[in-house]
Amino acid sequence: MEKKRRARINVSLEQLKSLLEKHYSHQIRKRKLEKADILELSVKYMRSLQNSLQGLWPVPRGAEQPSGFRSCLPGVSQLLRRGDEVGSGLRCPLVPESAAGSTMDSAGLGQEAPALFRPCTPAVWAPAPAAGGPRSPPPLLLLPESLPGSSASVPPPQPASSRCAESPGLGLRVWRPWGSPGDDLN
């Protein structure tokens, strides 16, 4: 039994030695390596490999990043629902299925994005009512279904460039939680 164990150890050490000769040829060929030398060079090589991989491809510990993302979704969804109760009219809920970690950019190229991940219907910010003091409510968000003369069906998604270009120059006041230039926060 002991002979088999020693034979396995020696075979593994010879394999390590032949692998290390390729990487440390200048150190190995000059002298005969002892078992301790082979093990030391193996540890040195594994540490250098580990350090080089950490710099190239940082991996979060465990699954902290995806689980953190999933834990944020319910809170944001609840915040959006509270916005409905206040009367902001925001009806663009987050999709709970997205907690699985899938995003639009993770889909293969050339494939249609699933209906769950299509952008929400474009909305229009209504101007704020006459200033009622520093704590006046934010302007209301009006979706096409709540605008007069609009149908209740959702229009097809538009490219991001056309959606983003709708708001500039309309003269509408957009509420920002951090405030905007000219707001009196006193």
UniProtKB/Swiss-Prot annotation:
One of its GO terms (cellular component) is chromatin. A motif (WRPW motif) lies at residues 175-178. One of its GO terms (biological process) is regulation of neurogenesis. This is Transcription factor HES-3. InterPro entries: bHLH_dom, HES_HEY, HLH_DNA-bd_sf. Transcriptional repressor of genes that require a bHLH protein for their transcription. Transcription repression requires formation of a complex with a corepressor protein of the Groucho/TLE family. Residues 1-49 form the bHLH domain.
